[in-house]
């Protein structure tokens, strides 16, 4: 029998399925040493984990190439782009393109396109870290796609 796949928003998924995804991420990132530990940390039974583990995947896990384009409005200070790229690299993103405008009135715009295939954290976590940088006035996702 051929299996059909559906793209479903997270907010309509049963809680058990969300927790299975969490348990799988804990195992993948080596935050749990065993299925039993991952299930316990995710607050599900091992039975639930085994029932759904091969049935639910994060969207980015089944795509070939996930590219996100980020827009930044930065204060013009020495080393800001380097520091920003360091945070992006630490998240496991591969920078594909960089476009920086000439600074005007102490501000510059930067657009980055990054591959998120090898990210070691969620995109929301990366955005939160980038927003915490003192020279970042604005950061937003302006595009994303699967290629």
Curated annotation (Swiss-Prot):
Boundaries of every ACT domain copy: 69-144
Protein name as annotated: UPF0735 ACT domain-containing protein GK2605
Pfam families: ACT
Family classification: Belongs to the UPF0735 family.
Gene3D superfamilies named in the record: 3.30.70.260
Entries under InterPro entries matching the protein: ACT-like_dom_sf (IPR045865), ACT_dom (IPR002912), UPF0735_ACT_dom-cont (IPR008310)
């Amino acid at each position: 029998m051929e299996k059909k796949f559906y793209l479903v928003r997270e907010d309509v998924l049963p809680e058990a399925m969300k927790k299975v995804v969490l348990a799988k991420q804990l195992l993948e990132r080596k935050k749990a040493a065993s299925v039993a530990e991952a299930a316990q940390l995710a607050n599900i039974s091992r039975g639930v984990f085994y029932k759904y583990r091969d049935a639910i995947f994060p969207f980015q896990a089944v795509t070939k190439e996930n590219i996100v384009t980020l827009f930044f409005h930065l204060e013009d200070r020495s080393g800001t782009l380097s520091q920003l790229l360091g945070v992006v690299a630490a998240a496991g993103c591969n920078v594909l393109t960089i476009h920086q405008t000439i600074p005007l009135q102490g501000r510059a715009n930067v657009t980055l396109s990054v591959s998120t295939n090898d990210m070691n954290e969620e995109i929301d976590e990366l955005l939160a870290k980038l927003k915490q940088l003192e020279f970042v006035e604005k950061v937003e996702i302006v595009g994303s796609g699967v290629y």
